[in-house]
């Protein structure tokens, strides 16, 4: 029975590690940081160990069928064994490919919640309007995935928004939303355009993984916390109390603010989450110049030529330029149906990683 021996051995090692992690978890009942680290590892190793058990069972069935075919003379048993062997030969390569994908290195932030910041870039009013349009898309996408969205700050202008920030929490949010970082280009006829000319504008989207307190340590003495009256939507408390909070990390100058919560305490907690995410990003960029350049290239300046995706309204078309994927269903995508694009981006990323997997 042919199978990938190198892959088998690699997966078997993960299954052994999974058992060891389970035993270790029983011994660290008071070390909460260690418990978290082990559980993060177990989430991946348990999935691989379970897949390995099914793989081994299918492989054992194929090997047993081969043995019967080589030794048995009973025609009925031979027929059944041949069926088992044929099924194993079809399924084992499929299972092996799935196992390879499971072995691919993953972003340690994939399981984390995200903080998203959206800003208009090139294109004037249409850019501000599209910030609101794409925000509605993300809100619908969050609902489709049973994720929870919390608005951090919304700054409206005469026609749309000059800034929107929000948090999305749920299962594996960053693993999917991270592909939204970059310049989004929109092509459509503005409502004020009398001659029907198509205008092109852009907005920028930044997606940051939320960081826990244990991941980013902040010295309280290095913070300046300012309170001010919230502006815009937010309920009866707006402009009556200084509920909005702005936190400045003095050593770096990084600022995080929130005004959409109902109380100063709630806004302060949200602003701290934003600050941790921003400080984590700053630390990553400082430690890894290559990462910094990658993100800079990804988000860019907002220039029309630096787009990751184009939304063409007249032709009901969306094109993701990173993978040359074009879908003629802009109306559906803007209603939150982003999975087809994001799944294709994930598959493309996995293909690249697979090429470097020595198995």
Swiss-Prot record:
This is Peptide chain release factor 1. Belongs to the prokaryotic/mitochondrial release factor family. Pfam families: PCRF, RF-1. InterPro entries: PCRF, Pep_chain_release_fac_I, Pep_chain_release_fac_I_sf, Prokaryotic/Mito_RF, RF-1. Disulfide bonds: none annotated. Its main location: cytoplasm. Methylated by PrmC. Methylation increases the termination efficiency of RF1. The modification N5-methylglutamine is found at residue 236. HAMAP family: Rel_fac_1. Peptide chain release factor 1 directs the termination of translation in response to the peptide chain termination codons UAG and UAA. Gene3D superfamilies: 3.30.160.20, 3.30.70.1660, 6.10.140.1950. Keywords: Cytoplasm, Methylation, Protein biosynthesis. It comes from Ureaplasma parvum serovar 3 (strain ATCC 700970). One of its GO terms (molecular function) is translation release factor activity, codon specific. It is found in: Cytoplasm. GO terms for cellular component: cytoplasm.
């Amino acid at each position: 029975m042919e199978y990938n021996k190198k892959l088998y051995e690699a997966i078997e090692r993960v299954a052994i590690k999974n058992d060891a992690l389970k035993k270790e978890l029983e011994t660290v009942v008071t070390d909460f940081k260690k418990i978290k680290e082990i559980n993060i590892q177990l989430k991946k190793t348990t999935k691989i160990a379970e897949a390995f058990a099914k793989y081994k069972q299918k492989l054992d069935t194929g090997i047993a069928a081969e043995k019967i075919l080589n030794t048995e003379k009973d025609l009925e048993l031979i027929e059944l064994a041949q069926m088992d062997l044929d099924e194993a030969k079809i399924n084992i390569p499929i299972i092996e490919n799935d196992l390879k994908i499971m072995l691919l290195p993953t972003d340690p932030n994939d399981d984390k919640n995200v903080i998203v910041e959206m800003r208009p870039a090139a294109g004037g009013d249409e850019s501000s309007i599209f910030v609101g349009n794409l925000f509605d898309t993300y809100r619908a996408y969050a609902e489709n995935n049973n994720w929870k969205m919390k608005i951090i700050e919304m700054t409206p202008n005469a026609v749309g928004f000059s800034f929107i920030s929000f948090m999305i929490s749920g299962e594996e949010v960053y693993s999917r939303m991270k592909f939204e970082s970059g310049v989004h280009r929109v092509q459509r006829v503005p409502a004020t355009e009398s001659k029907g000319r198509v205008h092109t504008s852009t907005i920028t989207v930044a997606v940051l993984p939320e960081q826990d307190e244990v991941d980013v340590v902040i010295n309280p003495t290095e913070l300046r916390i300012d309170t001010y009256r919230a502006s815009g939507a937010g309920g009866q408390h707006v402009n009556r109390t200084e509920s909005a909070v702005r936190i400045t990390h003095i050593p770096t100058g990084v600022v995080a603010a929130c005004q959409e919560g109902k109380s100063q305490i709630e806004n302060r907690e949200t602003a701290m989450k934003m600050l941790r995410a921003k400080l984590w990003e700053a630390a990553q960029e400082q430690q890894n110049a290559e990462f910094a350049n990658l993100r800079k290239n990804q988000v860019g300046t907002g220039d029309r030529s630096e787009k990751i995706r184009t939304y063409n309204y007249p032709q009901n078309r969306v094109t993701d330029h990173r993978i040359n994927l074009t879908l003629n269903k802009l109306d559906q995508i803007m209603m939150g149906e982003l999975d087809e694009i994001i799944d294709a981006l994930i598959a493309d990323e996995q293909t690249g990683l697979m090429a470097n997997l020595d198995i």
